[in-house]
Structures are given as structure tokens and as C-alpha cells.
Swiss-Prot record:
This is Hemoglobin subunit alpha-A. Red blood cells. GO terms for biological process: hydrogen peroxide catabolic process. The gene is HBAA. Heterotetramer of two alpha chains and two beta chains. It comes from the Eukaryota. PANTHER family: HEMOGLOBIN FAMILY MEMBER, HEMOGLOBIN SUBUNIT ALPHA.
Amino acid sequence: VLSASDKANVKAVFGKIGGQAEEFGAETLERMFATYPQTKTYFPHFDLGKGSAQVKGHGKKVAAALVEAANHVDDIAGALSKLSDLHAQKLRVDPVNFKLLGQCFLVVVASHNPALLTPEVHASLDKFLCAVGTVLTAKYR
């Protein structure tokens, strides 16, 4: 459960990275594919090379979902309901991959904004990303 302080920290992070969210989304995917190559199996039709238009396009979708969740931090489940349905019923992405993606996103945020990611903010952002992952896997059976 995100506290009021966690919610404020999450909103502050997304306020700070706002204009870079799409780039962060693509960089997060690139990092995930390089660090956890097994995640590539969900994208057999993608050019997964660095700077790929397809990775950038999907990174934009990832970023949009995270921004949407941050903008609706009091109702992440409602904000991501359709995306949860898609991942559970059609794409059937292994739930562990959401955790891996979240870890990579934390690294990207930290690498670009080291002063922003204090221990408290890091903990809040990690809790938020775990909440997003929980929502995205809630409809799995």
C-alpha cells in the first residue's frame, strides 16, 4: 500500500522526468533485453537492436502506462484495467517480467537523475512499480 508520502514521491519523480518518459521507456526496454535476454521471447517480430523504432514505439507505450498509473496513483487498477486484460488474456506475459521491467526502470531513472533518487524516493518508486506489476498480473488465472 502506497502511503501519502509514497504517492507524493512518485508524482515528483514523474513530474521531473515528464518530457523524457518516452526515452526512458525505450531505454528501460533496451536494458531489460540486454540484462534479461529471456524477455526477448515476447517480441520475436521486433528489431531489438539499440535505437530500434519498434523498441522506441513499445517504450512509448510502457512510458504512457507508467505515467497513466502515476497520474491515477489512487486507482492504479482502474487506470490500467484494459492493459491488465491484454497482458493476462491475450499476451500472457510471464508475471516475473513486470518485476524485471520495474528494476530496469529504476536503474534508468537513477542513471539520469541520481540526486532525485534518494533512499526514500527509491523505496516509494519501487513500491509503485510493484503495485503496477501486481495490477498487471491481477487478472491472470
